[in-house]
Amino acid sequence: MFFESYTEKVWGRQPKEISAAWGAQRIKGLSIRKVLIDMVKKLSRLNSSSATISQKGTETSLIERFLYPKLGPGQMWEEVANDLRAQGVNIHLRHNVKKLQFDQGTNKVISAEIWDDTSFTTQRRDYDYFISTMPISELIESFEGPVPEELPTAIQDIARKLPYRDFITVGLLLNQLQGPKGEELDDTWIYIQESDVKVGRLQIFNNWSPYLVADASKYWVGLEYFCNKGDSLWNLDDSQMIELAKREMDRLGLSRYDDCIDATVLREEKTYPAYFDSYQDFDKLSAAFNALPNLFLIGRNGMHKYNNQDHSMLSGFRAAELIAANKLDQSSKSSLWEINVEQEY
């Protein structure tokens, strides 16, 4: 299998140990026949003057063109935040939800205990609706006091035991970057199938947007490593991770060891919600959360779903639509879980 080595790097498991739901979600209805049809369509578009960014009807796995903010995806959310503030919306940054409290009569969440990282104080606030993007394993631990009967201990245990994979990015600033045969690399990202290196994927930030790199004669790349917090890879210090990344770029023939002129390391926990262990009972968990009228789970970690960024955003739109229409019943909320099961964009 072409992606076998990469899959093992990402999940730390052999593909046969992972739920088929993950593979089905990633490749959707892809087949050799559909790949060939897509190739013919692309050849036709090359000879057409009407080619646009629109790719309606294209298989999800075969999307090749997309819009990208010139300063990265965070730029879009900064603009959204500025627009909201201009409309009088308060956005509290550096605040962490620590506890959620239920009303036993309605099964609604009624208040949140919030830690303010700027003032080092705790506040309790009441809200009408709660939209969560935090990992479900952390959300379940935030419930304070008696919880609704829809969340018995067995259901809570499913949430607590949900598996995740953690993530390390090593950024290298390089004098030179090229393919193994000396060719120019125009990819935005490259999957690394080789089993003799630990890196799983390479991002070339120059190719995402030239505005992300101060000096156009240099190359910023990100080597992505998948691990679990506390394992041997996670426990390497930053200097050791940088050393590993430089050696592996050299081994792959993408740059020489001495081409690196600067480096940085970023670590992120629970980057990938995993599809094994207690995930096999996830349907019971999602049904239980659907029974809590004013609590909506969205996003990759919020739904424990390996969404792309666009599908994560769509889940937020769908939650807002349900709230605006006062559709808080289980049946209506179940529509959130139908996002990212379609075969096409």
Please give the residue ranges for each predicted region.
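Short, surface-exposed acidic
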Residues: 1-3, 16-18, 152-159, 254-262
